[in-house]
Amino acid sequence: WVDADLNGLR
């Protein structure tokens, strides 16, 4: 993903 660290999705 792109916002992996922001949203914590992946």
Swiss-Prot record:
Highest taxon in the source lineage: Eukaryota
Principal subcellular localisation of the protein: secreted
* Gene Ontology cellular-component annotations: extracellular region
State where the protein is found.
Answer: Secreted, Cell wall
Q: What are the entry keywords?
A: Cell wall, Secreted
Task: Output this protein's name.
Answer: Unknown protein 3
Say which species the protein is native to. Answer: Pinus halepensis
Species lineage:
Eukaryota, Viridiplantae, Streptophyta, Embryophyta, Tracheophyta
